[in-house]
């Protein structure tokens, strides 16, 4: 996130319809994509008439001397460069928040104008920013971009920031609008649309990170019925305009429980992919366990910050070794159920660009090759392929957002991205496969991706001077001679693989040159046994559509089962099936595909009872706790943990800003009568149940809900 006429209408509607019907339609399956992150204002000026619009005049600097002003990039500019993006192998673009942003200048400490060029101070989430589109805040430019992207085989992800509106102490004072109608602002908040708790002081406090203010940005109260409906309607509006996914800004700071219902609302409306920004340095972060529990259960994947830290350390420093990356992968993979949906990256708009911390193109190429071949969904920050960076003040905000000035298609980084993007399309090992470290020292990392018998083996030597002899290497590649897939782009040797057993075939000793990256690969021939590589979403209620992706499904429809119950098949192809979740018991079910007599592997899917409603549960005068003890909620539905009493299984921990009263927002099934109780989980794991009968509550059919009970002694 950012720190601090009739004919025209007809054309717009036509473009929107085209974008919806010609969408790449595998939006729920992103595992084989290459995402390209764009700060719209800094990419390309495709329409000079929107640079200084009347309703927000004076915020544009054509000289580009003021780094906190608008510089002219717009949606038309991205559309104009669609062939450039497609030529690089980009299959999805993540654009900065396109919603109508702050209209007023808030001078910096030196009196210089500042603007919300980055998009993270939304004032109207149902209109398009005039600097990005046109003076009427219409959707025309956005619809045209989506249509152009889809016709180029590129998906569109919008950055969505439901945590806050605009600055709360200046400018428009957090004012928020609903398609032009004023709803309220932070300073005159009689409706309670905002939280008023001051700025976050303790970044490891669960209550503060969700309910306090992020850098003076008016913190929205998503538990308010109006704000809940508003944000979900805004997301659905983007879906109506053809977007394929959402990058949810600052998920660590938006009410965690409410976001389950946001994701469910999106998935109920249509095919999509969601991932969020949960900033953390590494797996020792105090809230790391909260991050993986959120990702495992909410339906929202995350940006892989722990791996990002390791990538920047290993490739950005002369002293760090590949053990950092190997450890990060091991620790993250052990905790995240859907690790292949994590979005991997080298840098982004909130940190110095890689070349600002290590101005070495060889190291950048190695980091790029690693990101494009390791587990997860790779995301490339705009300009990386052109070696774009500005090192002023260390290259941090705003100097990590320079103007894109070159669009060369001949750079090594551009062609490396293209080459490995093509491999992600042709070899399922990169999108769906396991990842195994095969050989490692401080400078060399050799790892293998494998999906059934399709294999990709990658070797990286980051030493600038030492060639390493590689002996004792084993691989799942079949016996044979393999040339470097990256030949002509990056240097690397061929290898010879002998016959072994158990997926451990010996590689003849070879030398891995300094500053080299080599990729060797094998694609298994098509067969008749279905192979599931992905399902999306991973959680939902009966009736919701689920995309099952993989290979060998055949051209004739077979059977998709959730547990032992057959699902209604909506569409079927050899690599993709869309089916509706059948009426089965809530909880984890195994999805399988049957083709003739052949049955696929199974992938887990969490079945909910109904669409989700955010409900705030409060328990008063709970049993006393000491440091390390927490109150949790558990109950008779999968959403409440099915009476689980562990940290990872129960729902919580709850928040206690007015101890001994505790509260927690949880998304639960609409219209259902649920049973629940509160428990204390002590620091040593001991569980204390409240006494008495189970509490019962009838969840509203829509909107939001509130429960307020006393602890039963």
Feature-to-residue mapping (PLM):
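Substrate-binding/active-site clefts of carbohydrate-active enzymes
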Residues: 27-34, 39-241, 257-291, 298, ...
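Structural recognition of the beta-strand scaffold that forms the well-ordered cores
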Residues: 34-39, 92-97, 119-127, 155-159, ...
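Active-site-proximal helices and loops of the catalytic beta/alpha 8
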Residues: 145-154, 164, 232-338, 342, ...
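Short proline/glycine-enriched turn/loop motifs at strand-loop junctions of beta-rich domains
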Residues: 475-480, 551-557, 625-629, 636-637, ...
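Structured interaction patches on ligand/partner-binding surfaces of diverse proteins
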Residues: 496-511, 681-713
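Beta-strand/beta-sandwich contexts
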Residues: 525-557, 598-610
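Conserved structural position at the C-terminal beta-strand
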Residues: 593-595, 680
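Aromatic-rich carbohydrate-binding modules that target alpha-glucans
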Residues: 623-673, 681-700
């Amino acid at each position: 996130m950012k720190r601090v006429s009739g004919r025209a209408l007809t054309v717009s509607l036509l473009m929107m319809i085209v974008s919806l019907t010609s969408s790449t339609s595998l939006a729920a399956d992103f595992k084989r994509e290459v995402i390209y992150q764009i700060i719209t204002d800094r990419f390309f000026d495709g329409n000079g008439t929107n640079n200084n619009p009347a309703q927000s005049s004076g915020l544009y600097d054509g000289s580009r001397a003021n780094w906190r002003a608008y510089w002219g990039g717009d949606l038309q500019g991205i559309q104009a460069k669609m062939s450039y993006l497609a030529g690089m192998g980009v299959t999805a673009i993540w654009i900065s928040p396109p919603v109508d942003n702050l209209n007023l200048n808030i001078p910096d400490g030196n009196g210089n104008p500042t603007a919300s060029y980055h998009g993270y101070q939304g004032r109207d989430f149902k209109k398009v920013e005039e600097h990005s589109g046109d003076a009427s805040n219409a959707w025309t430019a956005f619809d045209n971009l989506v249509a152009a992207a889809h016709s180029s085989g590129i998906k569109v992800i919008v950055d969505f920031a439901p945590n806050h509106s605009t600055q709360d102490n200046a400018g428009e004072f957090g004012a928020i609008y609903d398609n032009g109608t004023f709803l309220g602002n932070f300073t005159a908040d009689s409706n309670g649309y905002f939280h008023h708790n001051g700025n976050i002081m303790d970044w490891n406090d669960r209550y503060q990170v969700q309910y306090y203010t992020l850098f003076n940005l008016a913190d929205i109260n998503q538990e308010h019925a109006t704000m809940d409906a508003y944000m979900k309607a805004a997301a659905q509006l983007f879906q109506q305009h053809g977007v394929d996914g959402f990058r949810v800004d600052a998920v660590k700071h938006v009410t965690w429980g409410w976001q389950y219902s946001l994701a469910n609302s999106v998935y109920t409306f249509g095919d999509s992919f969601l991932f969020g920004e949960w900033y953390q340095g590494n797996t020792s972060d105090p809230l790391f366990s909260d991050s993986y529990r959120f990702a495992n259960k909410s339906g929202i994947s995350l940006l892989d910050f722990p791996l990002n830290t390791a990538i920047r350390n290993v490739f950005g420093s002369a002293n760090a070794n590949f053990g950092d990356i190997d450890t990060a992968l091991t620790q993250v993979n052990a905790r995240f159920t859907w690790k292949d949906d994590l979005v991997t990256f080298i840098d982004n708009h909130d940190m110095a660009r890689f070349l600002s911390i290590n101005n070495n193109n060889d190291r950048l190429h190695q980091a790029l090759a690693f990101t494009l071949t390791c587990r997860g969904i790779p995301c490339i920050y705009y300009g990386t392929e052109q070696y774009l960076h500005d090192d002023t003040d260390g290259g941090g905000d705003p100097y990590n957002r320079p103007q894109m000035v070159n669009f060369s298609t001949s750079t090594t980084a551009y062609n490396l991205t293209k080459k490995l993007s093509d491999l992600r399309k042709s070899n399922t090992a990169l999108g769906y496969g396991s990842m195994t470290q095969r050989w490692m020292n401080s400078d060399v990392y050799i790892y293998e991706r494998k999906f059934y018998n399709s294999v990709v083996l990658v070797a990286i030597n980051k030493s600038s001077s030492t060639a390493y002899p590689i002996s004792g290497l084993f691989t799942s590649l079949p016996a044979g001679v393999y040339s470097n897939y990256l030949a002509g782009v990056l240097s690397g040797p061929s290898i010879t693989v002998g016959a072994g057993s158990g997926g451990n075939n010996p590689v003849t000793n070879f030398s891995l040159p300094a500053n080299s990256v080599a990729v060797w690969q094998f694609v298994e021939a098509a067969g008749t046994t279905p192979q599931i590589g992905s399902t999306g979403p991973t959680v939902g209620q009966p009736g919701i559509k689920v995309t099952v992706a993989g290979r060998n499904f055949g051209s004739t429809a077979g059977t998709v089962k959730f547990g032992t119950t057959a699902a209604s098949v909506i569409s079927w192809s050899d690599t993709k099936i869309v089916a509706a979740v059948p009426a089965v018991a809530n909880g984890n079910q195994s999805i399988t595909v049957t083709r003739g007599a052949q049955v696929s592997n199974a992938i887990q899917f969490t079945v909910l009872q109904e669409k989700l409603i955010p409900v705030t549960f409060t328990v008063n005068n709970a049993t006393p706790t000491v440091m390390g003890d927490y109150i949790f909620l558990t109950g008779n539905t999968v959403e409440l943990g099915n009476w689980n009493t562990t940290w990872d299984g129960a729902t919580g921990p709850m928040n206690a800003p007015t101890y001994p009263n505790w509260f927690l927002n949880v998304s639960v099934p609409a219209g259902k009568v649920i049973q629940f109780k509160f428990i204390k989980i002590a620091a040593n794991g001991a569980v204390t149940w409240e006494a008495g009968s189970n509490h019962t509550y009838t969840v509203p059919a829509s909107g939001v809900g509130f429960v307020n009970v006393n602890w039963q002694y």
